[in-house]
Amino acid sequence: MRPVMSRLGCATLAAAGVLLVLAPAALGQQPVSRLKGRVVSERGEPLKDADVRAEAFFGAAAGTFAGQRTFSTKTNAKGDWSILGIAPGIWLFEAVAPEHIPEIVALPIRLLTPSGPNAGGQVLIWELVLKPVRPPEDPRGRMLMDATTAARAGKSDEVRAVLRQVPEDADAEYLAAAGRIALVAREAGLARPLFMRALERDPASYRAAMGIASLFLLQRDFDSASRAFDATRNRTHDKDEQKWLSAAIGDLATIKVR
């Protein structure tokens, strides 16, 4: 398993001073849920045999995670996928399809779900629809695919070497794609400036906003993450994306910060 965000060095600093007002039963044995979703192209076409991976970074109430931390599956002919075993916490989901740039997002999953010996899991009422995109058919696009291959192989040094060559004149989509690849490699320090540059190029960039929201969440900066997820939701007209983004915003609303 790849290092659990060893390069998110600022995570604990971002969470310092945050007081979580926990639900009475937030501790103890946590129920698991089934999360369903789809992987489709930008045009909505199902992507068969895409790899879907889920990794937990924090547990209930954004504390220490206990249990099975990673899951992986593949999509069927309709692009559908399903994972049983998602416990309350903060999870990073990624979808990788052949010849596509990975789609990746961190989400809160029932952070303050009541627990106990009779607590049972259930199917989450929203589906996580992820949309990997094709890279440009030119040397720049091949550079992104090389970085993707290295990221999936856990070769962080190669990822850093490739992504540091991102052209200065790259557009927002290209920069956001590079940021997602950096996040797949768990190189948060490299992903952040790429997402920020993407937003500077295009303040309406959906994927750049989603990348920033994910980074805030992985740092447990819940207030900033909530605002960033709201900004992300405002940048898409896709009803499925709006639904799971609304679920994330609602989940973060259960955490009160003093």
Predicted regions and their residues:
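Register position in tetratricopeptide repeats
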Residues: R152, V184, L218, D251-R258
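Start-of-helix register in tetratricopeptide repeats
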Residues: G141, E173, R207, E241-W244
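Short, acidic Ser/Thr/Gly-rich low-complexity loop/linker segments typical of extracellular
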Residues: A60-D80
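A short, solvent-exposed loop/turn motif at the edges and junctions
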Residues: I90, E94-I109
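Canonical tetratricopeptide repeat
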Residues: A177, G211, W244-D251
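Structural motif
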Residues: G37-K48, T149-R152
